[in-house]
A protein has these predicted regions:
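Intrinsic low-complexity, disordered N-terminal segments enriched in polar/charged/small residues
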Residues: 2-4, 31
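Non-catalytic pre-domain segments flanking phosphatase-related domains
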Residues: 22-30, 34-56
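Asp-based, Mg2+/Mn2+-dependent phosphohydrolase catalytic module
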Residues: 31, 47-51, 56, 161-162, ...
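N-terminal helical cap/lid subdomain that shapes the substrate entry/recognition surface
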Residues: 48-142, 149-150, 161-165
Length: 253
């Protein structure tokens, strides 16, 4: 599946943070030779706005999230207290500690057991926590491959924990196309940046500057796509153009 070129958003908006906010993909991905060649000045203007590098968020932008399913899973394994905390968006310190790699997966499970005063095994805790994730549609994987084939350099930058990443890498990213070619996460992205491995998290601007440095790319030639506006603003603050896509639907449809 290629990017839907019928999406026509507003023009790129200058941002007080330094980068730009993009409302649609047509100004970013469509190559000038795909436009009316007679409109040379228009095509050149579009070419100047194209970005060579695209940094994707993971949650909602690629993988679906289902809070209620996660809550039901914790209740199913007898962790009603954690289910309540997830519903009320509490225990942020525990989840954040896992997200920035301050605690290991076994330590996360130990803390869950301590909070619940129970002996639920690690496997059940990890299963319930991973029920937050619902998968990656094949259409999104095809769109990523289409972008790579068109010459874009793709990167992933996610606030995530090792449990969720392991689930995504093992079960959601693997893909076989219509010609029988198989792909894994590393085939879609040139580099993968995880908060739990970097000990940094969005919206800290440092995670963006570090990703740019490790990738060897320039902010002014890079687009960042995220479902959260504060993360987009942080990217803009270091000169990256941002696309705020709250439901993860704009970028590929």
């Amino acid at each position: 599946m290629a990017i839907n070129n019928n999406i026509i958003g507003e023009a790129n908006q200058p941002s007080p943070h330094g980068g730009e906010m993009v409302r649609g993909f047509k100004n970013v991905f469509v190559k000038p030779d795909e436009q009316n060649r007679a409109c040379s000045s228009y095509a050149m203007a579009r070419k100047r706005r194209m970005k060579s590098n695209i940094i994707f968020d993971l949650g909602r932008i690629l993988v679906g999230l289902d809070n209620e399913r996660c809550i039901a899973a914790f209740e199913r394994v007898g962790l009603e207290k954690i289910a309540f905390y997830v519903r009320e968006h509490r225990v942020e310190d525990l989840f954040l500690a896992a997200e920035v790699g301050d605690i290991t997966t076994p330590q996360f499970c130990d803390e869950v057991r301590r909070l619940c005063q129970c002996s639920v095994p690690d496997t059940d805790i990890i299963w319930a926590w991973n029920e937050l994730l619902t998968g990656i549609p094949d259409a999104k994987k095809e769109a990523l491959l289409a972008l790579r084939r068109s010459g874009h350099r793709l990167f992933l930058l996610s606030n995530t924990n090792f449990m969720h990443w392991d689930k995504c890498a093992a079960d959601f990213f693997p893909y076989r196309d219509s010609e029988g070619h198989t792909y894994t996460a590393t085939h879609f992205f040139e580099k993968i940046f995880l908060s739990c491995a970097m000990h940094l998290a969005k919206p800290d601007p440092t995670i963006f500057t570090e990703a740019l440095r490790q990738a060897g790319i320039k902010a002014d030639d890079t687009l960042f796509i995220d479902d959260r506006e504060d993360n987009c603003q942080a990217a803009q603050s270091v000169g990256i153009t941002a696309l705020h896509d709250p439901e993860g639907e704009i970028w590929y449809k």
